[in-house]
Amino acid sequence: YVNRFVTFNNFVNSPIARYKDELYNLPFNMNTFSKMWGVATPAEAKAKIEEQIAELNIGEPKNLEEQGLKLVGRDVFEKLIKGYTEKQWGKSCKDLPAFIIKRLPLRFVYDNNYFNDRWQGIAEGGYTKLAEKLLEGVEVRLETDYFPFIAANPGIAGKTVYTGMIDEFYGYKYGELEYRSLRFETERLEEENHQGNAVVNYTEREVPYTRIIEHKHFERASSPVTYVTREYPAAWRRGDEPYYPVNDEKNNALYAKYRALAEGEKD
């Protein structure tokens, strides 16, 4: 369908994780395990993970840290999950609920393809052209606050789909939900190739950003300069962009109260 509007290249996302001075392939696969332990076969990798899990002897996980350790063992969790997760959520893994991680995909094949989709790629030249063509014939209003607009134009549509924050929609009646935000810093570098890959995740807690994106690798562009963007997790405050909600028991209980209100809406 989308190829009717733009041409897609054949980019395949194969991120790299950097922990201190060590580089690992993502998602967790045989290339990751071979670099970490020197193993060569799936059986050796599975045995190493099972050995570490058995040594920890964790019963019912009480928090995300115990859940992660029980799923993948100490090395993978501490090098590739713990610090990155704590940066994302702004909390210690010991203070996050176990249910945030249901499972951690481990692939016992030498394959760095992050996704399993048959068709993968990125719109050549970016997604602006695609968005413009998809929106042809559709009235779009930017820089428009939903609340005063809908108050001044009741019944403007037969059905309204609100995709903003549910607590804001109800005037924070039960209080604010907790969200996480992100901050991006983009920099032009006077070099042809900065990191050799589109995405490099920084998994240690002490590095303030979670990843660096080098944009030219999405389209294999050739130029004497390059642009990189660093992604920093941030606490959310009212007025900031909310990127994702904090998924814990307190927040979920508050969300359930707002959802009950939403279920009573007519349209």
Residue ranges of model-derived segments:
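Glycine-rich FAD cofactor-binding loop and adjacent beta-loop-alpha segment at the N-terminus
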Residues: 1-6
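Active-site/ligand-binding neighborhood in enzyme catalytic cores
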Residues: 11-13, 17-159, 163, 167-170
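C-terminal segments that line or cap access tunnels to active or ligand-binding sites in enzymes
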Residues: 168-267
